[in-house]
């Protein structure tokens, strides 16, 4: 309301709100534990896995786990690289529930590895892999 009605931003006088997300998204929350936990070493120095089902390529983009509640922490750290890294099926299923698969941001990964795997494109290819694996399971 302030931007539209204050008079300080005349170009916004006729703007209308088109869409608002109904649920705010957290950058990081729960991650499940699979038979393998992807680490930052797997992302930064990929070696390959015999059960690779997807690839990621986003840089490592870490943010403080406490977010704005940690003003003493640097806001973010980015480690760029020019390679893809493999994601094993073992990161996408439960280590103790036989028929439970994960897809999206909850895969078995460390905080630092998650800073690269949490992006939409990587989640999408992982979701495709999990769907295929579930159909074959």
Regions found by a protein language model. Give the residues of each.
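Flavin (FAD/FMN)-binding glycine-rich loop and adjacent Rossmann-like elements that form
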Residues: 1-137
């Amino acid at each position: 309301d302030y931007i539209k009605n204050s008079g300080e931003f005349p170009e916004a006088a006729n703007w209308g709100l088109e869409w608002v997300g109904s649920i705010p998204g957290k950058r990081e929350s729960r991650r499940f534990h699979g038979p393998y936990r992807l680490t930052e070493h797997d992302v930064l120095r990929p070696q390959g896995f015999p059960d690779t089902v997807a690839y990621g390529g986003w840089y490592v983009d870490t943010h403080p786990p406490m977010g704005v509640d940690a003003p003493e922490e640097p806001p973010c750290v980015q480690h760029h690289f020019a390679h893809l890294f493999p994601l094993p099926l073992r990161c996408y299923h439960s280590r103790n529930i036989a028929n439970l698969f994960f897809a999206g941001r909850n895969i078995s990964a460390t905080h630092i590895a998650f800073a690269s795997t949490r992006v939409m494109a990587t989640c999408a290819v992982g979701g495709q892999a999990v769907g295929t694996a579930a159909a074959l399971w």
